[in-house]
C-alpha cells in the first residue's frame, strides 16, 4: 500500500516521497536522487537516531505514513574532530558530518573503553543529543567537543535563595548552567532569564557545565534574581565626588568594584565599600544581600597599601549615624 514519508535536509528543506513499506533504503535514496539530484553514495538517511542500511526495508525500521527521515550528506574523505576529556586528554576521531552522536560515542568507546551511556558530549555549550548528526550542530573539520562522564545516579547540589530558602537539585557534573536553571524553574517557577547563579564568587555562564566550575556533590550555589532593566546607585568618595553606576540587584560586590575601576581607575583590592555602616564583603555577596536598592548611596574608602583604610573609622561613624 502506497504512503508518503518525508526527508528533512540539513537546510531544513522537507522532501515528500511516495513509497511502499517494502521499499528498501536504496530505493528511497534513488527517489531522493530523482527529486533532488543527490547521488545515492552521498546520502545518509537517519531515523530515530539510527543510520539506515541500504539493504533493509522501511518496514524493517517501522517507518510508517508521514514518518520523517533526516537526510545528511556523506563528505568524501570525511574529517577529523577532537574530543577533550576532563583530565585534559585530547582524542582524535575520523568522522563524517553525517555521523550521529551515537556513532561518535561508539568511536570513543572503541578508543577509550567508555560505554556510550556514560558519555555526555558538549559543543558550544550545548549537550549533544544522541540521534542528531554532527552537521546538525555545525560541527566541522577540527572542531573540539568536550567529553564529560555521566555519574551513575548523579549527585545532589543545593541552591540558596536571597530569602535563605535552600533548594535541593538532582544533577550530574555534565549538566550545563542552562540545565540547572531549567530545574530551578521547574521547582520554583522562576524563568531562567531572571536567574543568576553564583558559586565561589563567580557568576556561572549559561553554556558551561558544573564540572567546568568544579561544582561537586553537596556544593551550594547562590541564586539571585536579575532585575529587568537594572537600576542606578550612587557611590560617594572621601573627596565628596559622587559616582553613578548602572547595576542589577544580582550584581556581586566584586562586580560593583569592577565598575568603579572602569570609571575611576581604582584597583578593586584598594576599595572598601560601606553601606548602612557595614563593610560590604567580596565574593558571592550581592547588592540584594545587603538590601541595596534603586538610588541607594554607598561610601567608598581607599585601602592604604600595607595598612588600614584612610578615614575608615570616621566614615564608618558617618554612615552609621546617617
From Swiss-Prot:
GO BP annotation list: ubiquitin-dependent protein catabolic process
Propeptide: 308-322
Cited SMART domains: UBQ
Crosslink position(s): Glycyl lysine isopeptide (Gly-Lys) (interchain with K-? in acceptor proteins): 78, 154, 230, 307
Keywords: Cytoplasm, Isopeptide bond, Nucleus, Repeat, Ubl conjugation pathway
Record-linked InterPro entries: Ubiquitin-like_dom, Ubiquitin-like_domsf, Ubiquitin_CS, Ubiquitin_dom, Ubiquitin_ubiquitin-like
GO terms for cellular component: nucleolus; plant-type cell wall; plant-type vacuole; plastid
Domain Ubiquitin-like, first and last residues per copy: 3-78, 79-154, 155-230, 231-307
Chief localisation class: cytoplasm
Gene Ontology molecular function terms on file: mRNA binding
PROSITE patterns associated with the record: UBIQUITIN_1, UBIQUITIN_2
Function: Ubiquitin exists either covalently attached to another protein, or free (unanchored). When covalently bound, it is conjugated to target proteins via an isopeptide bond either as a monomer (monoubiquitin), a polymer linked via different Lys residues of the ubiquitin (polyubiquitin chains) or a linear polymer linked via the initiator Met of the ubiquitin (linear polyubiquitin chains).
Misc remark: Ubiquitin is encoded by 16 different genes. Ubiquitin is generally synthesized as a polyubiquitin precursor with tandem head to tail repeats. Often, there is one to three additional amino acids after the last repeat, removed in the mature protein. Alternatively, ubiquitin extension protein is synthesized as a single copy of ubiquitin fused to a ribosomal protein (either eL40 or eS31) or to a ubiquitin-related protein (either RUB1 or RUB2). Following translation, extension protein is cleaved from ubiquitin.
Family: Belongs to the ubiquitin family.
Name used for this protein in its record: Polyubiquitin 9
Gene encoding the protein: UBQ9
Amino acid at each position: 500500500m502506497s504512503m508518503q514519508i518525508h526527508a528533512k535536509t540539513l537546510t531544513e528543506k522537507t522532501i515528500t516521497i511516495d513509497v511502499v513499506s517494502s521499499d528498501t533504503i536504496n530505493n528511497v535514496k534513488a527517489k531522493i536522487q530523482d527529486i533532488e539530484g543527490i547521488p545515492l553514495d552521498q546520502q545518509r538517511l537517519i531515523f530515530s537516531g539510527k543510520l539506515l542500511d541500504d539493504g533493509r526495508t522501511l518496514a524493517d525500521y517501522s517507518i510508517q505514513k508521514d514518518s520523517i527521515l533526516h537526510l545528511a550528506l556523506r563528505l568524501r574523505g570525511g574529517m577529523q574532530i577532537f574530543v577533550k576529556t576532563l583530565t585534559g586528554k585530547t582524542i582524535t576521531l575520523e568522522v563524517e558530518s553525517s555521523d550521529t552522536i551515537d556513532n561518535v560515542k561508539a568511536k570513543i568507546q572503541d578508543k577509550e573503553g567508555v560505554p556510550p551511556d556514560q558519555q555526555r558530549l558538549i559543543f558550544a555549550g550545548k549537550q549533544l543529543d544522541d540521534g542528531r548528526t554532527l552537521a546538525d550542530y555545525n560541527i566541522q573539520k577540527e572542531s573540539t567537543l568536550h567529553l564529560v562522564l555521566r555519574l551513575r545516579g548523579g549527585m545532589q547540589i543545593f541552591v540558596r535563595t536571597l530569602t535563605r530558602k535552600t533548594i535541593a537539585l538532582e544533577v550530574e557534573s555534565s549538566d550545563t548552567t542552562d540545565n540547572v536553571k531549567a530545574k530551578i524553574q521547574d521547582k520554583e517557577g522562576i524563568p531562567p532569564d531572571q536567574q543568576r547563579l553564583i558559586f565561589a564568587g563567580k557568576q556561572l555562564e549559561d553554556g558551561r557545565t558544573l564540572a567546568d566550575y568544579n561544582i561537586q556533590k553537596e556544593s551550594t550555589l547562590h541564586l539571585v534574581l536579575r532585575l529587568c532593566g537594572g537600576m542606578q546607585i550612587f557611590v560617594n568618595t572621601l573627596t565628596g565626588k559622587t559616582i553613578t553606576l548602572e547595576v542589577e540587584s544580582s550584581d556581586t560586590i566584586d562586580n560593583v568594584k569592577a565598575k568603579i575601576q572602569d570609571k575611576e581607575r581604582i584597583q578593586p583590592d584598594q576599595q572598601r565599600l560601606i553601606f548602612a555602616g557595614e563593610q560590604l564583603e567580596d565574593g558571592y555577596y550581592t547588592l540584594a544581600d545587603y538590601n541595596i536598592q534603586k538610588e541607594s548611596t554607598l561610601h567608598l574608602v581607599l585601602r592604604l597599601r600595607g595598612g588600614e583604610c584612610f578615614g575608615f573609622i570616621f566614615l564608618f561613624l558617618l554612615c552609621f549615624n546617617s
